[in-house]
């Protein structure tokens, strides 16, 4: 792939092929490769580096020497073992056991001791890295490397397969040992296969041990001694084999071991219950992987500036000395240790943190040569693009894009344009009359165009830059701008891309193309119209991007001899976005293609149904036929369509379809009738009925399947004629061109850059060369944008001086306040208060030192996780404050109250800072950085940014570049998010645009010939032309045209929004009207019910009155009847009493 500098291997594959750690000059030897020896040594070194044991203090110097002896002995044993075993088995599944008696170690001859530990100056942990042996194939640049061994992180894991670093595919069957989980670091052996869907496939995967261990678990369980046999390290899970004596004789000397024999070695890690001492292990023993940004990316070509890494840095030495002082002070003060353990704040900080996200791999790729080169020959092409096939006739190329897009007028992305390639079945609405190969075609000149399709500038920002205000889902799905910028190319065959164009014709295009530039433009318009149907005559600007020259030998073409000549191929880059149809034109085109589909369907329907006139005449005759003709008298293959339909209709079968379908249907029916007769002869009526039922079910199934297939075909054809919603330039490829193999395709810039040596066609070479030049043009433009932004930044020294002045003023004010306080009474209280303040100040300083020391390891990891919150300016100020620490401590004692107040207010300020919403204010600068930072790490290394500035063709000196980089670079990195993003509160602040006048670097300082100056003076007057007797300024007209185009695009966008809003309003109005109708209907029903209820109420009231009157009458009648009953009863009682008296009187008389 061209992006990887002529190598097919991605950057992660070559990332670990660096040389070993540099050694001091006193030793004169180099550390052997750890991975080449054994995975055991690799894991030991990794574990020690992660635990922080490689930081060599005077107290544990002998301890590290002991570990070095063990590592070198095991490495030598593993190297010998690799000579007698298979390579893969020796790399992963070797179980070695190194046991050597004490006498053997003492009687070895004296040789140099290879070790990775410095004997002069202790090195910090961050500088001890794992190096891998450079494969033999890397020494030969002509042979691409097919195999890599590296360490990576498992990013995806499924049931049977997974991915390492998002690129390397592996199956679980290739895993050796413990099955890895997502986020685990693994040792990978991968091979490259370009024919597979995933180019890199892992052959073996092995999980690196000692991951996710608890803080209290020691990394080494058994403390080894110097002279004792080296026991197998059970912690790492890999054993070693016995080592022969001859190998140790070649590596270990008695003289080098003698100093180590005088003292008894102590264990690497003490037990947890022991108190603090010189060999006390660090408090935070957490195995954390090194940040990905610490690893240098692979250069596109072999690096030549390695000496910069060997220069000692005085700042690093000062920070190392300060770290040593802090460590000694901690070891001397056990009380501080106890107070730190009892501090609740430290307990909160020791709580298990959240799972660390996978840091993206640092990937920065750019061309490592000057980008202002106007020409190139075969050797220069071969040097620049090692993967590019160069045709045999090529001898020169002119890069005219340098003049077409100078630094003062760069190319502007963001002009929305898209293409829509139509199916070969769909015909163009307008007839194409362009001629591709005229009879007088001359091969001296060829004109070809590269048509760009690009999203709008707003879409580019959101899809590629991951703006600060975008949601997290959109920021995670970013794409590189090279994937969003696409080109319309022709396809000859399967995978052969070609630029669209053809040869010059004197009769159609005009004579003398060398003097008249419009001749080749006419050639490009004609050939593009003939091949794609796109009319480029609407384009207003034609940029001459490149000229490629071939030396053609004498040949015979179409029966005539063509002498040897030079063929010049001119690649044009027109503003094709002006050919984009407007919204109204797009709607007209959409209706036209739909109408074309309707007409085609009607014509096919007429052809399928036959002549409708004959069908109408024969309708009556078909109805009269009631009995079908006997099957033995019919021959379906010789019958006409009308006869076939009559026979089918008489048999109650479908008569629709083509003639072949009718013949098949009738033939099948006749066979069924023949079978029926045979069955009737056998008198099997029951079976005949069953067969009839089966036949009907089969016919129904066939009819349903036929209808379903017809519906699918209809929908497929309709999709070919339906245009998308967004306007695009319609492409109708000329299917008859290039021997019927021509087609068109839309390919992104990254795909065009992914060429191979196998693409050995001349037209593919032209497309690949254009892609490289276009990519270099974008690199130059984005690099110049970064350069301008660095020029606009203020100098860092001015800011330091202002800060120092402000600090001095603050100190004077505070001293005056203290003098005022001394004049006040209450001396006893002030004295006691001063003593108390001094004690609190000492405690506060101790806590501050502990807090800084304990959070040292956390800062490095948090830098990767919180890169957006990293402030290079503030960190630089912190370094300056550390340099003046003695003076600062004096002022801190006097400013105790201010410090306490600051410590109380600091958490609230941090919370407010976290809550503040960031917003991107400089989107152009962010896109410029993102174009180089392909993995969105958020920073660029200093050496990469320096080389980018050198490639711009500004002829800058090293001092000038260093001065620019000092403004933004911190710890060898430039965190560009601090230059492009800010909080919403600071959004309205205007940027300081005090840009320097000299934006072209040192180009104006170079001597220029007088001829070029005269030509420039002549070209300045070319912009004025005489048209209809008036002088016309072409430049101003073009500017007005661009403005009008922008206004038109904005108006169309607003119109589209208004149409959408109108549609929504119509829908809401329709819904409101429907709801109004329903509510009015309900209202009428409610009124009707109300009137009915009122009538019922009146009726019930009348009935109530009637009932009351009737009851009153009844009551009166009852009262009269009761009175009469009472009177009658009284009369009866009187009569009974009279009778009783009479009877008594009669009895008495008797």
UniProtKB/Swiss-Prot annotation:
**Cross-link Glycyl lysine isopeptide (Lys-Gly) (interchain with G-Cter in ubiquitin): located at?**
637
Cross-link position per record: Glycyl lysine isopeptide (Lys-Gly) (interchain with G-Cter in SUMO2): 1012, 1067, 1135
Pfam families membership: BURAN, DBC1, LAIKA, S1-like, SAP
Q: Where in the cell is it found?
A: Cytoplasm, Perinuclear region
**Tissue specificity as recorded in UniProt:** Expressed in various epithelial cancer cell lines, including breast, colon, prostate, pancreatic and leukemia. Expression is regulated by growth factors.
Recorded coiled-coil stretches:
594-618, 1033-1114
- Biased composition of type Basic and acidic residues is found at 293-334, 341-352, 673-687, 694-713, 796-817, 832-855, 890-915
Q: Where is this region: Interaction with GATA2?
A: 203-660
UniProt keyword Cell inner membrane present: no
Segments of this protein annotated with the region Interaction with GATA1: 643-1150
For bias kind Low complexity, which ranges apply?
134-146
Q: Where is the SAP domain?
A: 636-670
Q: Name one GO molecular function term.
A: RNA polymerase II cis-regulatory region sequence-specific DNA binding
The UniProt transmembrane annotation reads none
Task: Please give the residue positions where the record annotates the modification Phosphoserine.
Answer: 456, 685, 697
Q: Where is this cross-link: Glycyl lysine isopeptide (Lys-Gly) (interchain with G-Cter in SUMO1)?
A: 1012
A single GO BP term for this record reads: positive regulation of cell population proliferation
Q: Name one GO cellular component term.
A: nucleus
Query: Compositional bias (Acidic residues) spans?
Result: 610-621, 856-889
Q: Note down the stretches annotated as region Disordered.
A: 124-146, 285-354, 600-638, 673-713, 796-915
Could you tell me what this protein does? Associates with components of the Mediator and p160 coactivator complexes that play a role as intermediaries transducing regulatory signals from upstream transcriptional activator proteins to basal transcription machinery at the core promoter. Recruited to endogenous nuclear receptor target genes in response to the appropriate hormone. Also functions as a p53 coactivator. May thus play an important role in transcriptional regulation. May be involved in apoptosis signaling in the presence of the reinoid CD437.
Cite the record's note on assembly: Directly interacts with ESR1, NR3C1 and p53/TP53. Interacts (via N-terminus) with CALCOCO1. Interacts with MED1. Interacts with GATA1. Interacts with AR and GATA2.
Q: What is the designated name of this protein?
A: Cell division cycle and apoptosis regulator protein 1
């Amino acid at each position: 792939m061209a992006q990887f500098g002529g190598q097919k291997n991605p950057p992660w594959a070559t990332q670990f092929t660096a040389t070993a750690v540099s050694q001091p000059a006193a030793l004169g030897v180099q550390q052997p490769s750890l991975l080449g020896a054994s995975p055991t040594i690799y894991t030991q070194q990794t574990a020690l580096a992660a635990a922080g044991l490689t930081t060599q203090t005077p107290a544990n110097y002998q301890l590290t020497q002991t570990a070095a002896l063990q590592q070198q002995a095991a490495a030598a044993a593993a190297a010998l073992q690799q000579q007698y075993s298979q390579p893969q088995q020796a790399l992963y599944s070797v179980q070695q056991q190194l046991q050597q008696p004490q006498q053997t170690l003492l009687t070895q001859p004296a040789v140099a001791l290879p070790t990775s530990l410095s004997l002069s100056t202790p090195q910090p942990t961050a500088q001890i890295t794992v190096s891998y042996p450079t494969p033999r194939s890397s020494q030969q640049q002509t042979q691409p490397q097919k195999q890599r061994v590296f360490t990576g992180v498992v990013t995806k894991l499924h049931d049977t397969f997974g991915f390492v670093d998002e690129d390397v595919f592996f199956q679980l069957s290739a895993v050796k040992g413990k099955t890895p989980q997502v986020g685990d670091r693994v040792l990978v052996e991968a091979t490259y296969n370009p024919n597979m869907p995933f180019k890199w496939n892992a052959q073996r995967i092995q999980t690196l041990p000692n991951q996710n261990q608890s803080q209290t678990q020691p990394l080494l369980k058994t403390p080894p001694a110097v002279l004792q046999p080296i026991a197998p390290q059970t912690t790492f899970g890999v054993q070693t084999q016995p080592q022969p004596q001859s190998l140790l004789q070649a590596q270990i000397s008695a003289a080098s071991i003698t100093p180590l024999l005088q003292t008894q070695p102590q264990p690497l890690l003490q037990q947890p219950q022991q108190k603090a001492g010189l060999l006390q292990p660090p408090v935070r023993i957490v195995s954390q992987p090194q940040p990905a940004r610490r690893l240098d990316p692979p250069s596109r070509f072999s690096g030549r500036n390695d000496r910069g890494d060997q220069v000692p840095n005085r700042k690093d030495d000062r920070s190392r000395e300060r770290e040593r002082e802090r460590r000694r002070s901690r070891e001397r003060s056990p009380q501080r240790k106890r107070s730190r353990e009892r501090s609740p704040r430290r307990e909160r900080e020791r709580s298990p943190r959240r799972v660390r996200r996978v840091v993206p791999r640092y990937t920065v790729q750019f061309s490592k040569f000057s980008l202002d080169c106007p020409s190139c020959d075969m050797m220069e092409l071969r040097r620049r693009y090692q993967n590019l096939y160069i045709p045999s006739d090529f001898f020169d190329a002119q890069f005219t894009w340098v003049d077409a897009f100078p630094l003062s007028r760069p190319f502007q992305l963001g002009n929305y344009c898209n293409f829509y390639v139509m199916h070969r079945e769909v015909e163009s609405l307008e007839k194409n009359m362009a001629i591709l190969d005229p009879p007088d075609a001359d091969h001296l000149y060829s004109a070809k165009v590269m048509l760009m399709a690009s999203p709008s500038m707003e879409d580019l920002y959101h899809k590629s830059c991951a703006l600060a205000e975008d949601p997290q889902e959109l920021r995670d799905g970013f794409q590189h701008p090279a994937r969003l910028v696409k080109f319309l190319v022709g396809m000859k065959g399967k995978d052969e891309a070609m630029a669209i164009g053809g040869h010059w014709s004197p009769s159609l295009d005009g004579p003398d193309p060398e003097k008249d530039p419009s001749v080749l433009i006419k050639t490009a318009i004609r050939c593009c119209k003939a091949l794609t149907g796109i009319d480029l005559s609407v384009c207003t600007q034609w940029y001459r991007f490149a000229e490629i020259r071939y030396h053609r030998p004498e040949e015979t073409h179409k029966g005539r001899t063509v002498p040897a000549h030079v063929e010049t191929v001119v690649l044009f880059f027109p503003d094709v976005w002006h050919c984009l149809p407007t919204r109204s034109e797009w709607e007209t085109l959409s209706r036209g293609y739909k109408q074309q589909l309707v007409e085609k369907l009607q014509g096919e329907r007429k052809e399928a149904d036959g002549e409708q006139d004959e069908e109408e005449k024969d309708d009556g005759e078909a109805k009269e036929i009631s009995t079908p003709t006997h099957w033995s008298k019919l021959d379906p293959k010789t019958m006409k369509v009308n006869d076939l339909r009559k026979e089918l209709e008489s048999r109650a079968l479908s008569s629709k379809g083509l003639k072949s379908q009718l013949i098949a249907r009738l033939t099948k029916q006749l066979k069924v009738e023949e079978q029926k007769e045979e069955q009737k002869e056998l008198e099997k009526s029951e079976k005949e009925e069953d067969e009839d039922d089966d036949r009907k079910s089969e016919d129904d199934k066939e009819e349903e399947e036929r209808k379903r297939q017809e519906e699918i075909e209809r929908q497929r054809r309709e999709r070919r004629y339906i245009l998308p919603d967004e306007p695009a330039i319609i492409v109708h490829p000329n299917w008859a061109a290039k021997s019927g193999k021509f087609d068109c395709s839309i390919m992104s810039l990254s795909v065009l850059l992914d060429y191979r040596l196998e693409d050995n066609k001349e037209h593919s070479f032209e497309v690949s060369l254009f892609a490289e030049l276009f990519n270099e043009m974008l690199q130059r433009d984005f690099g110049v944008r970064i350069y301008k932004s660095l020029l606009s930044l203020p100098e860092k020294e001015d800011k330091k001086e202002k800060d120092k002045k402000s600090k001095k003023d603050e100190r004077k004010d505070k001293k005056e306040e203290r003098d005022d306080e001394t004049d006040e009474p209450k001396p006893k209280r002030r004295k006691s208060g001063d003593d108390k303040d001094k004690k609190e100040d000492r405690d506060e300083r101790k806590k501050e030192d502990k807090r800084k020391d304990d959070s040292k390891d956390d800062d490095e990891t948090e830098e990767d996780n919180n890169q957006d919150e990293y402030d290079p300016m503030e960190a630089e100020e912190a370094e300056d404050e550390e340099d003046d620490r003695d003076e600062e401590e004096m002022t801190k004692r006097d400013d105790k109250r201010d410090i306490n107040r600051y410590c109380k207010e600091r958490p609230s300020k941090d919370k407010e800072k976290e809550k503040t919403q960031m917003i991107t204010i400089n989107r152009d600068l962010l896109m410029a950085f993102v174009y180089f930072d392909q993995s969105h790490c958020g920073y660029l290394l200093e050496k990469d940014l320096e080389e980018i500035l050198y490639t711009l063709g500004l002829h800058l000196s090293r001092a000038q570049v260093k001065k620019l980089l000092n403004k933004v670079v911190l710890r060898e990195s430039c965190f560009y998010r601090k230059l492009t993003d800010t909080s919403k509160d600071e959004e309205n602040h205007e940027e300081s645009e005090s840009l320097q006048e000299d934006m072209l670097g040192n180009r104006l300082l170079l001597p220029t010939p007088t001829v070029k100056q005269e030509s420039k003076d002549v070209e300045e007057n070319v912009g004025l032309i005489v048209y209809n007797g008036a002088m016309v300024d072409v430049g101003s007209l073009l500017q007005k045209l661009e403005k009008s185009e922008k206004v038109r695009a904005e108006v169309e966008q607003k119109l589209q929004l208004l149409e959408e809003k109108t549609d929504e309003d119509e829908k809401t109005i329709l819904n409101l009207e429907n709801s109004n109708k329903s509510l009015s209907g309900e209202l009428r029903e409610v009124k009707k019910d109300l009137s009915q209820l009122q009538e019922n109420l009146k009726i019930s009231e009348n009935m109530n009155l009637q009932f009351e009157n009737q009851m009153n009458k009844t009551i009166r009648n009852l009262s009269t009847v009761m009175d009469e009953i009472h009177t009658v009863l009284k009369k009866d009682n009187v009569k009974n009493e009279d009778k009783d008296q009479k009877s008594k009187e009669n009895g008495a008389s008797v």
